[in-house]
Design a protein with these regions (language model features):
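Conserved AMP-binding/adenylation subdomain of ANL enzymes
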Residues: 177-194, 202-243, 253-257
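Conserved AMP-binding/adenylate-forming core of the ANL superfamily
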Residues: 14-58, 62-66, 83-88, 173
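ANL superfamily adenylate-forming
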Residues: 98, 104-150, 160, 257
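A short N-terminal helical cap/helix-turn-helix that marks the beginning
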Residues: 1-15
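Gly/Ser/Thr-rich phosphate-binding loop
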Residues: 241-246, 255-316, 328
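Conserved beta-loop-beta connector loops within the AMP-binding
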Residues: 330-350
Length: 354
C-alpha cells in the first residue's frame, strides 16, 4: 500500500530529516527499500526469523521497516529507551535473529546481547566493532516477496504490558494497509500534508497514523527523534502544517506554554490527539488558543491501531469519535456478554478488517 502511494510521485520529497535536513524523494525511498530488501534476503536474515528494530524516528527507520516488509519478513519494533533486560525479553520472546539499532542506543543493545549471542547486531551508521546498515544493502529486489497478505505477520509490536510482561501482537499486511486507508478516510487526509513526526514509529500510533499514512496517502514526513516543542512548532510553521498529530501531554504544552505564541500556526485546521484520553477542558483550551478543531480517536495495538475518530465535520469535545468504515462495535456486560442499552457502561467489543 505504501508503494502504491509512492510510485506516482518519484521526484517529490516525502521524508525530511528534521535534525540534519536530509531529503528523500519517493524514488529514493523505493530504491533504498528494494536494495536493503535484496541484501536482507541474500544474507538469509528473512524470512527465517523476525528482525528487531530499536531506534528513534529517522528516514532510515522508514526504509528499514518497509524493506523487511518488501522482503517478506517480520519486524518487531522496540522502544529505544528500553533497558537491557527489556530488550532481552522482547528479542527472546519474538525469536529475532538480527537487531538493528542506532548509535545512541548501541551501548545498551550490546549489553542486552551479552546473554543472546545468537542475535546479530547491526547499527544505523557505523561502529568499529559491529555490522553497519550500509553493509546489508545488496542488489535491488524488484518484486515484493509473495506472502499471504491476510495471514503473514509483517509486524510484531509489543503491548504496554499493563497486566504483566509486554506481549507481541501479530499484525498482517492487510491489517496495516486497511487501517491506513480507514484512518485516512476518517481523518479526511489530503495529499501534500506535512507532519512533524515525533510520535515514535516503534509505537503502533506513530507507525500507522504517522509513518504509513503519510507515505501511502501523498504526505510528507519531517522526522523528529524525540519531542521538542520548539522544533515541533518550527516545523509546523515552516511547512504550513494543516494538522498536528499529538498526545495529551503535548496538548497541555500547546494550551499553556508561552513559546506557542512565537510561531505562525495560522495554516492549522485541526489537532488530532490519541494514545490516551483527554478531557473536554484541555481539548477546548487547545482549540481556543490555536483557533482550530481539536479531535480525538480511539484504538489499541491489536486494532492496528485505530477504530474510532471524531469527524472534522462534527467535532465533539472530549469524545473519541465514530467507528471507522467497516468497523463494528458492541457495548456488552462483562459478566454476561449481552448487549447493554444506551447510557449503560460496559465492555467495548470491536470487530473489523484492521
Amino acid at each position: 500500500r505504501v508503494f502504491e502511494g509512492l510510485a506516482p510521485r518519484l521526484e517529490e520529497v516525502v521524508i525530511i530529516d528534521g535534525i540534519d535536513g536530509r531529503r528523500f524523494t519517493a524514488g529514493d525511498v523505493i530504491d533504498h527499500v528494494k536494495r536493503l530488501a535484496g541484501g536482507l534476503r541474500a544474507a538469509g536474515h528473512v524470512p527465517q526469523q523476525p528482525i528487531a528494530l530499536m531506534a528513534p524516528n529517522s528516514p532510515e527507520y522508514c526504509i528499514i521497516f518497509h524493506a523487511v516488509a518488501w522482503a517478506g519478513g517480520t519486524i518487531t519494533t522496540l522502544n529505544p529507551t528500553y533497558t537491557a533486560h527489556e530488550i532481552r525479553h522482547q528479542l527472546h520472546d519474538s525469536g529475532a535473529g538480527l537487531l538493528i539499532t542506532d548509535p545512541a542506543t548501541l551501548a545498551v543493545a550490546k549489553e542486552a546481547l551479552e546473554e543472546l549471542p545468537e542475535v546479530q547486531l547491526c547499527v544505523i551508521g557505523s561502529a568499529d566493532d559491529c555490522l553497519s546498515l550500509s553493509a546489508l544493502y545488496g542488489p535491488a529486489q524488484e518484486q515484493q516477496c509473495p506472502v499471504d497478505l491476510d495471514r503473514h505477520s509483517v509486524v510484531l509490536p509489543y503491548s504496554s504490558g499493563t497486566t504483566g510482561l509486554p506481549k507481541g501482537v501479530c499484525l498482517s499486511h492487510r491489517n496495516l494497509s486497511i487501517n491506513t486507508d480507514q484512518t485516512a478516510q476518517g481523518a479526511e487526509s489530503r495529499a501534500g500534508e506535512t507532519a512533524a513526526a515525533f510520535l515514535p514509529f516503534f509505537h503502533i500510533y506513530g507507525m500507522t497514523v504517522m509513518m504509513n499514512l503519510h507515505l501511502a496517502c501523498g504526505g510528507v514526513l519531517v522526522t523528529m527523534p524525540r519531542f521538542d516543542l520548539e522544533l515541533f512548532l518550527r516545523i509546523c510553521q515552516d511547512h504550513r502544517a494543516r494538522r498536528m498529530w499529538i498526545v495529551p501531554p503535548v496538548a497541555l504544552a500547546l494550551a499553556k506554554h508561552p513559546l506557542v505564541d512565537a510561531y505562525d500556526l495560522s495554516a492549522l485546521e485541526q489537532v488530532f490527539s490519541g494514545a490516551a484520553p483527554m478531557g473536554s477542558a484541555l481539548s477546548d483550551a487547545v482549540a481556543s488558543r490555536l483557533n482550530c478543531a481539536m479531535l480525538q480517536g480511539y484504538g489499541m495495538t491489536e486494532l492496528a491501531p485505530v477504530s474510532h475518530i471524531t469527524p472534522l465535520s462534527t467535532p465533539r469535545s472530549g469524545a473519541s469519535g465514530l467507528a471507522l468504515p467497516n468497523t463494528r462495535c458492541r457495548i456488552v456486560s462483562p459478566e454476561t456478554g449481552e448487549d447493554l442499552p444506551p447510557g449503560e457502561e460496559g465492555e467495548l467489543w470491536i470487530k473489523g478488517p484492521q
